[in-house]
Every structure is written in structure tokens, then in C-alpha cells.
């Protein structure tokens, strides 16, 4: 059995979302590596530049696409200052590219708490101890913070600075060998 890296909840019956699921399943069964990796591009108002980074898409629920991050990270600050993003996915095993333009916002505190408590203690210790995108002194200091979090923190309690982002595409474009164009 092949394990899905993205949790699909309620499935929208609109064509773009059905197409996304079909292409995801094709890539999954073609053994796509790091299938959950998506590139999210955003605009930074403070210095007027566009920035991109890879994140792991975790949940697709109806028309909502959800990933998680440290709310104090530069990317999170960009999302909050300019709530539009462009998301790109490329699955090379099936030669499919998907691009979505979307509005983005934080998920609710209740949603974050529920999701966080469902994760493994090690993942939560990492989220608690990580100062995403900040300069580190050494690998040893990161490891020390992680071990300290494992030992001293409530690993089921979601920190205030951690949570999800949900984006809802308003433009959904897919290109592959067998289908090209806007959906």
C-alpha cells in the first residue's frame, strides 16, 4: 500500500479540485518523491521583493489547501502583510505542473491545537524548539534546544507562534502531457 503524504478530507466536486486529486494520485502511484513539496511565492511589502520557498502541503479540505509554519518566520510575516500568493507544484514522474494563485490566511487557533495534538511528540518538539529562518550558533545549540523541548515542554500544547496557513485558489492552472490549460 502506498501512503499518501497529504490528507484529503472533504473532496470538492469542482473540476480543478477533482483534477488536482487525479494528478496527485497519478504522481503518488508513479512513486513521486517529496510529493507534498509546494513552492509558495509571496510579496514582501517592506522591501518590495517577491520571495519563494518550499513548504509541505499537509491537508486538502474541500477548496482549502493547508500547510503549517512558525508564525514568526519571515514567510509568515509576508503572508500577513500581503495576503496573495502563487503556489507551484511540479511532479516530474508524471510531468505535471500545477500553478495556483490564491488568497492566504491563518487557520484558526482551534484547528491548530487539534492538528498539533495529533502529531508525533518528536515533530512537536522540533516545532517548539525551532527558530525558523533565524541564524543559529551551531548544530549543537539546535540539538540542545530540541532535547530540552522534549524534556521540559508539553508536547501536545500548540505554541502561539505555530500554526497553519490556508490558501484558496482563485486561479488554477495545470499542464501535463495529456491536458493543458486553465481549469
Where are these regions (language model features)?
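Charged, gly/pro-rich active-site loop segments
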Residues: 2-11, 97-183
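An N-terminal domain-cap segment
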Residues: 8-62, 66
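Generic beta-strand structural signal
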Residues: 36-38, 63, 83-87, 94-102, ...
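Short His-Asn-centered micro-motif
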Residues: 41, 68-70, 168
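Coil-to-beta-strand transition motifs
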Residues: 50, 62-64, 95-97, 179-180
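A short mixed-secondary-structure module that forms the rim of ligand-binding clefts
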Residues: 58-95
